[in-house]
UniProtKB/Swiss-Prot annotation:
CDD domains: Ribosomal_L1. Disulfide bonds: none annotated. One of its GO terms (molecular function) is tRNA binding. The lineage of its organism: Bacteria, Pseudomonadati, Pseudomonadota, Alphaproteobacteria, Candidatus Pelagibacterales. Part of the 50S ribosomal subunit. This is Large ribosomal subunit protein uL1. InterPro entries: Ribosom_uL1_bac-type, Ribosomal_uL1, Ribosomal_uL1-like, Ribosomal_uL1/biogenesis, Ribosomal_uL1_3-a/b-sand, Ribosomal_uL1_CS. It comes from the Bacteria. Coiled coil: none annotated. Keywords: Repressor, Ribonucleoprotein, Ribosomal protein, RNA-binding, rRNA-binding, Translation regulation, tRNA-binding. Belongs to the universal ribosomal protein uL1 family. HAMAP family: Ribosomal_uL1_B. Pfam families: Ribosomal_L1. It comes from Pelagibacter ubique (strain HTCC1062). The keyword Nucleotide-binding does not apply.
Length: 229
């Protein structure tokens, strides 16, 4: 039986469009009636059925409004770069001894960054890091000589954009407690990233078929982007 809170939500859960995203964000936040700080999420349907094979997107976006989450960042680097990593805010910094701990299953971090030189050693730990989604990836900015920038990006707020086998992408733009300006900046940063991805692909038609916005426990609204991506 539907709860009292659910009954108070709008009846339509789809096909509600908005030309002005600011108005839609206000509506989504208004429907966040639970006691916890609900996440505001975007979902995209990708036009991934192409004659030349499926479209696979995997990239990362730096969210100017942040994510509202504290990320524990670990860095595997040469000793000469250890201070740079610590000064940038890395929670754990190490080299060969740290790699041995990772091999033993000590994965007390949420993001792993390394230098290209150390990636050769970490690549042998695919069975340990891969299933947890922790293997550093140059395309995602987690393999870099510029350790300071990589750590800063990870700490300030990043989101991975990746479609599943059915062509769906899910990504959070923040929390109910965020100011509208934070959510807007994150929203547009994600769209800009998808637009760049489209430019790197050979497509027939648009990359994105449909876009929806919702909160953790709210209804889903269809977003009219105003431009084709």
């Amino acid at each position: 039986m539907p709860s009292k809170r659910f009954k108070q939500l709008p009846e339509k859960t789809k096909d509600l469009t908005a030309d002005v995203i600011e108005n839609l964000l206000a509506t989504v936040k208004k429907n966040c009636t639970t006691k916890f700080d609900e996440s505001i999420d975007l979902s995209f349907q990708v036009n991934n059925k192409q004659k030349k094979g499926e479209v696979n997107i995997r990239t990362v976006v730096n969210l100017p409004g942040g994510t509202g989450k504290k990320v524990k960042v670990a860095v595997v680097c040469e000793d000469t770069k250890a201070k740079e990593a610590k000064d940038a805010g890395a929670d754990i910094v190490g080299s060969d001894e740290f790699i041995d701990k990772i091999k033993a299953g000590e994965l007390n971090f949420e993001k792993l960054i390394c230098t290209p030189g150390m990636m050769v050693k970490l690549s042998k730990l695919g069975k340990v890091l891969g299933p947890k989604g922790l293997m550093p990836n140059p395309k995602l900015g987690s393999v870099s000589e510029d350790i300071k920038q990589a750590v800063t990006n990870a700490k300030s707020g990043q989101a991975e954009i990746r479609n599943d086998k059915d062509g769906n992408i899910g990504v959070s733009i923040g929390k109910k407690s965020f100011h509208d300006d934070q959510l807007l900046k994150n929203f547009h940063a994600i769209l800009d990233t998808l637009e760049k991805e489209k430019g790197n692909l050979t497509l027939k038609g648009d990359l994105i078929k449909n876009t929806f916005i919702t909160s953790s426990m709210g209804v889903s609204y269809k977003v009219k982007l105003g431009k084709a991506i």
